[in-house]
Amino acid sequence: MEKGTNTRKKLLSDAFKLFSSNSYENVTFSELEKASGVSRGSIVYYFENKNGLFSEMLKTFVFDNSSVKRVPKPYQHSLIAFYNYFIEILKKEKNKLIELGIKNMNEALFFIEMSALLNISDFRAIASKWHEEEKNIWYNIIQNAVSTNEIRKDIDVKSVADLFEKNIFRCIFYRSILNLWCRHKRITYEL
């Protein structure tokens, strides 16, 4: 059983590497076989088809790994503890991806999410649900911070939660898009 679990994890990691720099259409079963050292039959056994592998890779590497849901409940009672724990999660994820040979996590996620948008019919609904869950967690964290006097009581909790969820963490993603565009146009910028 452990061998099967390891094979499945390896397939997901190898698929992530391939999809992080190639569009969905450009990743073939032959490339998946070559990258993983696993036969097409085994890939189909674990994931049914390329779409199944891609969907599971999305869940594992996009929705589960970079989620504030990964912060344990004891750390969700303080904004500072929550924020620091989440930053550590992101650092660990970045290091794991570097070990996989992926130097820019946000660029990889951008490529994968664009492929998902174009090839997974319910991706918008899944992403929207995930986003709502993330927003609700931030709202609860900020509400806790207000009730424990960690931050002022006269703030608009929803606005501050949106600030954290959108502006702070999404800024990283959009900066990556700017990097891609600038490289494509062969220009440089400084933030």
Where do the language-model regions lie?
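N-terminal intrinsically disordered/low-complexity leader segments
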Residues: 1-6
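Hydrophobic alpha-helical connector segments
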Residues: 56, 70-106, 157-164
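Short helix-capping/turn signature of helix-turn-helix
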Residues: 47, 111-120
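Amphipathic alpha-helical packing segments from all-alpha helical-bundle domains
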Residues: 80, 102-106, 121-148, 159
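Hydrophobic/aromatic-rich alpha-helical bundle segments in the mid-to-C-terminal region
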Residues: 124-132, 146-191
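An amphipathic alpha-helix signature
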Residues: 12, 83, 87, 135-143, ...
